[in-house]
Amino acid sequence: MSSINELLQAKYSPINSRFRVVVAWLLGFALIQPGVTQEVEDQVSDIVSEATEERIEQAMEDLLTDIESRISEDALRIQTDHWLVMAEADVFEQLAQEGYLFDRVSELDGLGFLLAEVAAPASFDLSATRAGIYEVIGGDRADVDLNHLYTAGVPNGLDADMAGDAPRELLALPTDLSDLSLRIGIIDSSVDQGHSAFSQASITTRRFVENDAPPNFHGTAIASIIASNDPSALGLAPRAELFAAEVFDQTEEQGEFASTVSLIKALNWLITQQVSVINISLAGPPNRLLETALARVRERGVLAIAAAGNGGPMAQPMYPAAYPEVVAVTATDNRGRAFRLANRGEYVDIAAPGVNIRHAQAGGGYAASSGTSYAVPFVTVAAARLLQSNSEPAVMLDALYASAVDVGAPGRDQIYGYGQLQFQ
């Protein structure tokens, strides 16, 4: 790897020492951040091509602000004051015999695990703690990680009352869909059940945050796309039985977020409700416990379907969608074109309508939003319907992908996955 000084001498020798310090700081940051080096180097090259030092200085300041913002956002994605352990009961018994004490332990009967939350001292080292536990139990029979945070994504292009495309107008739907009683799980923010869209809906809720008034915009929107029974804005499956796990909390500093703990507890509850699919319209960083929980969900014969993310074409993979046990959904508009802010990558499985989608708005009325979150319900409903006649998720997915319309490069691609969803 080239040294910072070599990079500066080779590429930025015309810049005076003041600006060289700024460039050196940026490159130094990039060299210790996997996947960022080339991006920063390219951006610096563009900056240096500007005609005047004044413009260079302003561009450098903007780039520095952007990088600092990214660092701040990443820090907010983790609760560093405690760490998590998840394993089967016999592992916890073994750890207890070796002197490990866990204050908050939850039984996850649906998943078959115990989940412990442990206060983390200032000197906490995740890698050392994980290695110590593995040494005691003789292998990786436990998952150890931090409590990462996840977001539902900011709705893009929120429009006025009754704007946008009604979900039922975007795809050719089978005639039996309006009468099917599908058991569908949702992991999201809370649902405004007082909305007219849910006047006759079957919605069972369970809250996994302590907030007495959790946010409800996103959950209300997703639930209505699936199961609204308002004649003027019918959902895809108005007779579906929804089991809504409310996992989002809200603070002034962090905004709306869901923790790893709340997600795992929600998955556990939904398994006990005998749902066939779980709609997960949120995204965030990878987490070992969440990955294991989702693998167990799949072992139980339940299919998790998640949003690919709204970070843009150059963004890193988002989770849980990027896990192999999860169906990753991207969004398209009403002409089949890819949503401009959608993530891309090899993990993308299938595309569905997700641009300018009409949905119920918490507090009353309707609005329209765009994002991969709003595409997930289409795939969720299609999968739930197919699972009624074929209970094996792998076989059902083969059929679902085979029926998709290939709208990108031939075969599976990083923009549309297997193609645009079609109901069979």
Language-model regions, residue ranges each:
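Mature extracellular/periplasmic domains of secretome proteins
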Residues: 174-179, 256-277, 288-304, 314-328, ...
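Inhibitory N-terminal propeptides of secreted protease zymogens
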Residues: 40-153, 277
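Protease zymogen maturation seam
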Residues: 110-115, 124-200, 415, 424
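Catalytic-core environment of secreted peptidases
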Residues: 187, 192-198, 203-205, 331-373, ...
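C-terminal subdomain of the subtilisin-like protease fold in secreted/lumenal serine endopeptidases
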Residues: 68-73, 267, 274-282, 288, ...
